[in-house]
Regions:
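Acidic/histidine-rich alpha-helical segments that form the ligand environment
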Residues: 84-130
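Short, contiguous alpha-helical
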Residues: 38-90, 125, 130-171
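Solvent-exposed, charged/polar functional surfaces in cytosolic regulatory/catalytic domains
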Residues: 20, 24, 118, 122, ...
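Active-site flanking loop/helix segments enriched in acidic
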Residues: 32-38
């Protein structure tokens, strides 16, 4: 799994990571989805699979918001307004809270799917040059920032779900 270096490679990795994640999430029973059965994003904390999905939606929305801010000529808040890069655990907890009112597991999965489709549409709106041949945030290209906050967390989530699914199968 090499780091994407082109628009086509990014779109391919986005699709592959989303498909893998979707397959694993489809195996999570609704009655388990809201139980704190995973290691959280903050050391020593626990989270539910629903929290994990909320985290993914939150990051996806954040990426979309960065681009909304940029298009509006506003200063882009990286990683998010009121948060620093060394406070990502707190930001994860904010994302859990942002979606805690969604108590329907199927609805949360639909929201994740819609968010992923919006990210694909975002990428499709840029040329390869705009994504990978000019810095966007410091030394990072736009494509790399999108990959950091979509493909990478999807892969991490899939790995977490593998552990849970093995435990559920063994039980």
């Amino acid at each position: 799994m090499a780091v994407p270096e082109s628009k086509a490679a990014l779109l391919e990795e986005m699709e592959k990571s989303a498909l893998s994640l979707r397959k694993k999430l489809s195996r999570i029973p609704a009655e388990i989805a809201y139980q704190e059965c995973l290691e959280g994003h903050v050391t020593g904390s626990r989270m539910s699979v629903a929290n994990l999905v909320s985290y993914l939606i939150g990051w996806g929305e954040q990426v979309l918001y960065w681009h909304h801010q940029e298009a509006a000529g506003e200063e882009v808040n990286f990683p998010a307004k009121g948060f620093k890069w060394n406070e990502l655990g707190k930001l994860a907890q904010k994302y859990y809270a942002d979606y805690q009112h969604i108590t329907s597991w199927p609805m949360l999965l639909v929201m994740l799917e819609e968010n992923q489709q919006q990210l694909v549409a975002l990428v499709n709106g840029f040329s390869d040059d705009e994504l990978y041949h000019q810095p966007w945030y410091g030394k990072w290209t736009r494509g790399r920032m999108i990959q950091f906050n979509s493909v990478s967390p999807y892969r991490n989530a899939s790995a977490r779900l593998n552990v849970l699914l093995k435990a559920l199968t063994a039980a």
